[in-house]
From Swiss-Prot:
UniProt keyword annotation of Nucleus present: yes
Primary location class: nucleus
Organism from which the protein derives: Candida glabrata (strain ATCC 2001 / BCRC 20586 / JCM 3761 / NBRC 0622 / NRRL Y-65 / CBS 138)
Function, as annotated: Acts as a negative regulator of fluconazole resistance, primarily through down-regulation of the ABC transporter gene CDR1 via inactivation of the PDR1 transcriptional pathway.
Keyword Metal-binding: yes
Disruption of the gene: reported phenotype: Leads to fluconazole resistance and activates genes of the PDR1 regulon including CDR1, YBT1, YOR1, RSB1, RTA1, PDH1, and NCE103; as well as PDR1-independent adhesion-related genes such as EPA1, EPA2, and EPA3.
Keywords assigned: Metal-binding, Nucleus, Zinc, Zinc-finger
Protein name per UniProt: Negative regulator of PDR1-mediated fluconazole resistance JJJ1
Amino acid sequence: MKTCYYDLLEVRSDASDLDLKKAYRRKALQYHPDKNPDNVEEATTIFAEIRAAYEVLSDPQERAWYDSHKEQILSDTPLNPNDEDDDYVVDSTVTGVTTEELMMFFNSSLYTSIDNSPAGFYQIAGKVFAKIAKDEVSWGLRLGLDGYKNYKDMEFEEHINSRGYILACDSSKANLSNLLFPIFGYSSTSYEELKLFYTKWSSFNTLKSFTWKDEYMYSRNYDRRTKREINKRNEKARAKAKEEYIKTVKRYVNFIKKLDQRMKEGAKKAAEKRLADERLRKENEMKLRKERLNNEQGAQFHLQSWQTIDQENWKELEKQYEKEFEKRNVDKDDELIGHEFTKNQFQTNNNSQHEDVDEIIIYDCFICKKSFKSEKQLENHIKTKLHKRNLDRVQKEMKKDSMALGLDELSDYNDFDSAESETEKLYSGMDLNDIDAELKKIEEQLAQSSVTDSEDFTDDNNDTEDQNSLVDKLSNTNYDIEIDDEINDDTNEEVQISGADNSETQNAEQDHDSNGDSEEEKEDELTRILRELEESKTSRSNFSDSDEEWSNKKKTKAKKKKNKANTPDKQPVTANKNDAKEVCGECRAEFESRNQLFSHIQTEGHVSPLSKVKKGKRSKKNK
């Protein structure tokens, strides 16, 4: 007697998933074989039915299908809708396995014993699949399809009846290509064959026409419209029956697959094998990688000459040290201990030498207190501004310390290159007697100029800041002749207002100012030369400073003159020729035009600074 799944779990037909889970746990604890050691066989059978019932009812689709076909599954005989009409009976050779007959095998109680016996799981399911395969081949032959004559599925079903299921399976393994559908096999069937079986049967499709499902009898006496309507309804019934049959076969395949322990064990073994193969593959790859790396390193690495040890020389050294040590020690025990000690010491020294090979060289900058890993990094650091500033600061500090301690002669400051080396050579090559004679001549010239120009000395000494042309003449042998054709605006205004008398007074004052300034600048130049000669031994920086100041003065003077040349005159010059006369700065000769003065300067070589004439400062009386 078949048992309903709901009755087996003791739940209602509308029970929820949570209720089904609780009922399954309760029944499993009650009928599990481990909980019933006195009645293991019966407990195993009941527990298998409980597990099958829970697997069907826990799946929503399987549960819906079970509810709709529950009466057909629980009945011992297939339900035939044509039982009421005894006049029409369908031949079983035409229909084959029907949907109603297949429904009877959805009961898990039929598969309680998982063995190769006739009442076991493998033979019951295997015979059902063989019957379905036979029907498909017979329908293919009936329809005259190509290739179906070569299929041996019909013979396999006959071999089961004549030889038995196990022998039929063994004999058909050699001719699996002649079968339309793979066989189900038994307990020793391989996992690969099972995968092929379930793959093929999961895509099952039938060739049956299901004409026995027609609702109306077709007759030629019907008119065309009636015939068309009858054919339409009969085709609809056939399609519905065919679809139901295909779904039933696929569901039966899934039902058997859940109960098949071979698939579970085979999947587990396949997973373990796959992991083992993956592990072995990785190990082989690692081994090959290590071998390849070792081969590459061995091919690239060569011992240097200093890394190799001459064994003969090493043995000779050991013998020499052993002899020396034996001479020092008389006691034999001490000799043995010392002998071992020397050997160990030599070995440790040898190991330490090999360990020293792997030392890392670090490059330090002691000025900036930084470390570098390569010489190139240190060279790049030396070129940076930060290092140069720190180096200048350290040099200045060292110079100050040496000067404070009186260690100028001992300092290494002379090792550094100086920009004033040529100037130092010039002064060092001069004779002191020549210098004294030159100084006496300069003093005589200053005395004569002071006597001649003392009468014209006035209170305009405050306006002598920019008159440095005479210093240029004394300090440089090459004269820089500068000619300015422009007339200052202040001079133009003075000429227009004061007239000829004021212009003469202005020229006199300019000459006086230039003479006074020249005397002071001569004295300043003499004192500067003497001071530079005295300090040339202790410091060289003064020469560079003087040259820089000298070049800066020239640059500023050139810029001022350029700006004056670019500045346009605000008012035109309206002075008379008699009021403004050009005077030579050397011989004091007067000329009526500037061109005459320039020609005189070029022929006679009388060059004097024209800054006083250009600036045209006003006298205190006019102010």
